[in-house]
Regions:
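N-terminal intrinsically disordered/low-complexity leader segments
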Residues: 1-4, 183
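Helix-turn-helix
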Residues: 8, 12-54
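Short amphipathic alpha-helical interface segments enriched in basic and hydrophobic/aromatic residues
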Residues: 18, 22, 64, 68, ...
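Short helix-capping/turn signature of helix-turn-helix
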Residues: 45, 91, 103-109
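Hydrophobic alpha-helical connector segments
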Residues: 54, 68-98, 149
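Short, basic, alpha-helical segments at the C-terminal edge of helix-turn-helix-like DNA-binding modules
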Residues: 57-64
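Amphipathic alpha-helical packing segments from all-alpha helical-bundle domains
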Residues: 64, 95-101, 109-136, 140, ...
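Hydrophobic/aromatic-rich alpha-helical bundle segments in the mid-to-C-terminal region
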Residues: 114, 118, 133-183
Length: 183
């Protein structure tokens, strides 16, 4: 039996994807990172394709749950939900922009991954739209505000903007006013 667990292989593959893209998610490379043999990999995965499928599923499940949890934790208080979502992005503790970016990079070369990203993006935008409805916006206005917020944040990371957490936190009230229309 392999002394390394399935989660360790998945986490190592996740880090490899972030650092090297899909080319880094090769069985030999992962085994070397872990100081294991190829055989250790096959205790848990049929092949590389299964590992990649599970990585994509892990991203889709965990990243969507982070957004949905904001709604459940703040009981339809839109401004609290907005700030919780902003903190989720700014803190970069639970939400990992590098992980998100690695999946988006992969989606540029895989139609299957692109479709999963599209579904996740729609779910995330739906959560943001719900937040804006809780603030008091309806219909297209709630949707557009949600899209602007989401596209802004995804673009922030895609552009590689470099600001300290304190710089980002200092801007939160201004973004809040611009995006929610509230102080």
């Amino acid at each position: 039996m392999s002394p390394l667990g399935r989660e360790i292989w998945l986490e190592t593959a996740r880090r490899a994807l972030i650092e090297e893209g899909t080319a880094g998610v090769e069985i030999n490379k992962l085994a070397k990172r872990l100081g294991s043999s190829r055989g250790g990999f096959y205790w848990f995965f049929k092949d590389r394709a299964q590992l990649l499928d599970e990585l994509l599923e892990l991203w889709a499940d965990t990243s969507t749950v982070l957004f949905e949890r904001v709604l459940h934790n703040h009981h339809e208080d839109g401004l609290k939900e907005y700030l919780a979502m902003t903190n989720l992005w700014v803190d970069e503790e639970e939400y990992d922009p590098k992980w998100d970016g690695a999946i988006r990079d992969w989606a540029r070369t895989s139609e299957v991954v692109r479709k999963v990203v599209e579904v996740v993006d729609q779910k995330r935008i739906a959560v943001l739209e719900e937040i804006f409805r809780h603030i008091g916006y309806q219909g297209k206005e709630a949707n557009v505000r949600a899209r602007v917020m989401y596209y802004h944040q995804v673009g922030y990371y895609a552009m590689g903007v470099r600001e300290s957490q304190s710089e980002r936190r200092a801007l939160i009230p201004y973004y809040k006013r611009a995006l929610t229309g509230r102080d």
